Amino acid sequence: MATPEEVAYEKFLERVRRTVYVDELTPLATAPVISSAFNQFGTVKKVSFIPNYLGPKELPMGVLVEMENEEMTQAVISTVSQLPFMVAGMPRPVRACAAEPNMFVDKPKKPGRTVRFRWIKPNDPDFDKARRVKRLARKHSAENSFMLKKQLEEAEKLSKQQAETAVTHHKKFEMMDKLLYDGVAQKLAGRYDLKGFPYR
């Protein structure tokens, strides 16, 4: 017979299998927006935001979307990985993958697992390993901050490029509207003997 800890952990694993991790989401997205975006794949039970502790607020964030069953979760993952899926007007599509147990804040303790710790003395054989791990953690932190900086620069560059493109297209459409409303296009059509001018 299973212990209460094992039953709780099994329920948690079932919840993990029903959950999708969505990344590259704009910080302006809210829970109702995300729910309505993913309700087209099935019923959304819960939306949990994963805060970004490592960088500024402008960075894209992640969210855990719990669906009603595993089939809906697989539908979300397959559709979002094959086709671009935009949420809340973000200029780039979001990414989706299956959630993992360590992504949850309320993860229960694994049954039968105990955490042990001890102080290591400098003459201990594991002391050198611990120092190397500590150095490696610092190196990873520096690499991570560098990558976050580069990611922000790329996002800003992409945003400027898209803004310039939008302004250019808007000017073109304004010029076309002006030509049509002023009658210049009709005069040119008459001049070049084009019949059946579609506008006006």
Curated annotation (Swiss-Prot):
Deleted gene: phenotype: Hyper-dimethylation of histone H3 lysine 9 (H3K9me2) in several genes. Impeded use of distal polyadenylation sites at intronic heterochromatin (HC)-containing genes (e.g. histone demethylase gene IBM1) resulting in a lack of functional full-length transcripts. Silencing of transgenes such as 35S-SUC2 and genome-wide CHG hypermethylation at gene body regions, leading to reduced transcription of several genes (e.g. IBM1). Abolished expression of At4g16870, a transposable element (TE) of Copia-like retrotransposon origin, associated with methylated status.
Q: Which InterPro entries match?
A: Epigenetic_reg_gene_expr, Nucleotide-bd_a/b_plait_sf, RBD_domain_sf
Record's GO cellular component terms: nucleus; protein-containing complex
Respond yes or no to whether keyword Acyltransferase is given for this record: no
Q: From which residue to which does any coiled coil extend?
A: none
Q: Which SUPFAM superfamilies match?
A: RNA-binding domain, RBD
Q: Which domain of life is it from?
A: Eukaryota
UniProt entry keywords in alphabetical sequence: Nucleus, Plant defense, RNA-binding
Using the chain's own numbering, where are the disulfide bonds? none
A molecular function annotated in GO for this UniProt entry is: RNA binding
Q: Where does the RRM domain lie?
A: 18-101
Asked whether the keyword Nucleus is assigned, the reply is yes
A GO biological-process term: positive regulation of defense response to oomycetes
Q: What does the function comment of this entry state?
A: Prevents gene silencing by suppressing CHG methylation as well as histone H3 lysine 9 dimethylation (H3K9me2) status at target loci. Collaboratively with ASI1 and EDM2, the AAE complex regulates alternative RNA processing (e.g. alternative splicing) and epigenetic silencing (e.g. H3K9me2) of intronic heterochromatin-containing genes as well as genic heterochromatin-containing genes by promoting distal 3' polyadenylation, thus being required for the accumulation of their full-length transcripts. May also modulate transposable elements (TE) expression.
- Subunit and interaction comment: Component of the ASI1-AIPP1-EDM2 (AAE) RNA regulatory complex composed of at least AIPP1/EDM3, ASI1 and EDM2 and may contain CPL2, AIPP2 and AIPP3/BDT1. Binds directly to ASI1 and EDM2 and may function as a bridge protein between them. Co-associates with EDM2 to histone H3 lysine 9 dimethylation (H3K9me2)-marked chromatin and transcripts at a critical proximal polyadenylation site of RPP7 to hamper proximal transcript polyadeylation/termination.
Q: What is this protein called?
A: ASI1-immunoprecipitated protein 1
Q: Which organism is it from?
A: Arabidopsis thaliana
